Amino acid sequence: MSRFFVSGYNSESSSEEEDLLSSEEELLTSSGEENEDSDFFNDDDESSSDEEDGRPSGPAYFLKKSFLKGAGGDSDSDSDDEGRKVVKSAKEKLLDDMKASIEVINVNKRTNNWIVVLSEFEKLGKLINRANQQNFGTPKFYVKLLASLDDSITETVNNEKDDKTMKADEARAFNTLRQRVKKQIKEFQVYFDLYKDVPENFDQEDESLDSFAKNQETREETRTLSPIFHNLKLINESRGKKNIDKSEQVTTLEGLISDEASDFELISLYQSLLSVRFDASSNQSFMAIQDWRSNKRDLNNLLDILVKSKVYQLSEEGQTTDDIDIEPTANEDGVKVIYGSVTSLIDRLDDEFTKSLQNTDPHSMEYVERLKDETEIYNLIVRGQAYIESIVADKQQSNQLARVVLRRLEHIYYKPNQLIKANEEEAWKNIKPSTQTPSEVIESLTQFLQSNKVFAKQALLYSIYYYAVNGDYNKAKELFLSAHFNLSDSALQVSYNRALVQLGLSAFRSGAIEESHKILNEMVNSQRSKELLGQGFNSKFPNQATVVEKQRLLPFHQHINLELLECVYMTCSLLIEIPALASNKDPKRRNASLKSFKSKLEFHDRQYFTGPPESIKDHIVHASIALQKGDWSKAYNLLSSIKIWHLFPDHDNLLAMMKNQLQIEGLRTYIFTYKAVYSKLSISKLSSIFGLLQENVSEVLTQMIEKLDINGEVSGDYIVFTTDSQRSKLQELAIVMNDKIQLLTEKNEKTSSNGYAKKNQSQTQPQAQSKEVEENKFRYANVNTNTDEF
């Protein structure tokens, strides 16, 4: 029968049972009480003897003996109280373990036992992680320990400099501990600095850092904030969080801007407003045009406030305050320097403008309309430069000033002088009148950046590009040769290639044909010209381009026309190769580029039907054929009909230069062709044929004689050719024909003798040599004749 129905159970024992069960949920019994619970598992004899001793039965049987009425005496209850332990929560136990580890650390660090200290510090770190996982937080005494360890480590390092007594294993443990303590200090840097400043705030060691921070915030919130700074604080705290409506924040900040706000409030508002707008477009290809123009307007308003204010300055060297509504301390001049960067805001605005151009169709009217905003951004850059110059003490060492100067240079270096002059007049009309010429502007900006190690080479490349674009080839060449760009960083590759190509184009415009050909040779023959000039990708999948490759791309209006580049290169090849072909020089000594041009001519000659020239290449090939015949006038007409020359700003002068070069090279080609036919030629006749002055003809002929291109002398109005040891073209063809006839005759003899060569009579031998002939016949029969020419 169940014990519930055993006699001895009554209502009084039931009520006592409920009270005792509730008390058991609140108290944890000692080990002695657990021994008493084990009486239940005794055998039957002991249970029967317990019943005789008056022990309870029924439901009361399962209750603790010490809680029942009449069970035991005062001595029993006293013994139970003595055996009962103090109960601690999980948090208290964890704190005790931490304090025990800290005590071990403090003891062993005094004896420089760093192995034990490291072991206990790692153990303490695990306990800290457990505390954070259970939402107990990091106690304040952990920060005190970090400060104490930092001091001990510093002292030990100083002692070790004098006498190195630390063992190898101790040194390894010490260095490991040093790095981990440094890492932990960095993680709790705010509290660490606060402890160093006000140690009294950490007297309550068991308090967690989270609750301590909340208490600090509660004390700070007792100070009332103005509506502007209250909203600013809310917006700043929400930055970086998900699901935040940026447009709503922009609307809120725009509504806070009013004439009643102080200068400090307006400066803070504009900084936050500009940053929020930039953040809103961070996940887009480029910033919306309306938002970009709003940021440009607000940045101009911010500069207006900064220029007018004599109390506040915005600089990267400014002071940061703990609260956004607290103004920085004034300096000796009474000026409060606020932490911020006008240069960074201008850089970001300019980058968004560039990305907008890169993501717009360059052949559409949208691109042209967007490009009109470049004047506005340039005016803003000039304003920013003027403001930074007014607040910076050491201009040469200011990085923010160097950055904005480089930005200004990037917007004008590729333009002709007329556009630069217009931009400068528009930018300075509201600041102060400027009397500098475009070349003086470029030179002053470049000279300023030469003191900056980061931007010096970049500025010099921009300067070279500018001089090359505006026709000052000698100046650009001098700068390029003196710069030693071969020691520069690879980040300058695009700028270097652009400057080099523009230098080659400038050499062509100035009449330095051979130099232009050498400069442009490698770039034109490269398969990666677009990529090397920052004008596109050569891969089949542009979407796979990296971020760095996309950043190197330039807007379309800064591109160098690759068709113009190829046209200039082929024209240079024409002017160099046609006289070289007529001179009958050793073809092995010719450059590979000239051979490729000759192959184009040979390919054209093999065509059965050739129509009128259509492409740029066709015009140049037809002009080459005309020049070979000495018809320089036809060659000039073909070249001048190419419309791409109009891309040069001074195309009239360019065509005049090309005409003169064609006349000179036509004269040289004529001399090379007919020097073996004529014994002398009239200089006046040559002058009339090629449209040159007699003085110029005499000068060209004299140069050819000095370079040993021809043998002769200029005598009065004639050039007299002497006997030329060099074979003529007809003689060379006759010699080649004779060699081939001999080869054909020998081959026919071998064929008629069934593969045997014709034997001389002196070689007739008896039958003993027949075996040797038999062995050698395959050598004659297998002659390779694939290379024979007929």
From Swiss-Prot:
GO CC annotations, alphabetized: cytoplasmic stress granule; eukaryotic 43S preinitiation complex; eukaryotic 48S preinitiation complex; eukaryotic translation initiation factor 3 complex, eIF3e; eukaryotic translation initiation factor 3 complex, eIF3m; multi-eIF complex
Matching InterPro entries: EIF3C (IPR027516), EIF3C_N_dom (IPR008905), PCI_dom (IPR000717)
GO biological processes: formation of cytoplasmic translation initiation complex
Record GO terms (molecular function): RNA binding; translation initiation factor activity; translation initiation factor binding
Disulfide pattern: none
Keyword Transmembrane (UniProt): no
Protein biosynthesis among keywords: yes
UniProtKB keywords: Cytoplasm, Initiation factor, Protein biosynthesis
Amino acid composition bias (Polar residues), ranges on this chain: 751-770
Region annotation Disordered: where it falls in the sequence: 1-62, 748-790
Domain PCI: 556-728
Localisation: Cytoplasm
Biased composition (Acidic residues): 14-53
Subunit record text: Component of the eukaryotic translation initiation factor 3 (eIF-3) complex.
Protein's job: Component of the eukaryotic translation initiation factor 3 (eIF-3) complex, which is involved in protein synthesis of a specialized repertoire of mRNAs and, together with other initiation factors, stimulates binding of mRNA and methionyl-tRNAi to the 40S ribosome. The eIF-3 complex specifically targets and initiates translation of a subset of mRNAs involved in cell proliferation.
Family: Belongs to the eIF-3 subunit C family.
The protein, known as: Eukaryotic translation initiation factor 3 subunit C
Organism: Lodderomyces elongisporus (strain ATCC 11503 / CBS 2605 / JCM 1781 / NBRC 1676 / NRRL YB-4239)
Source species taxonomy: Eukaryota, Fungi, Dikarya, Ascomycota, Saccharomycotina
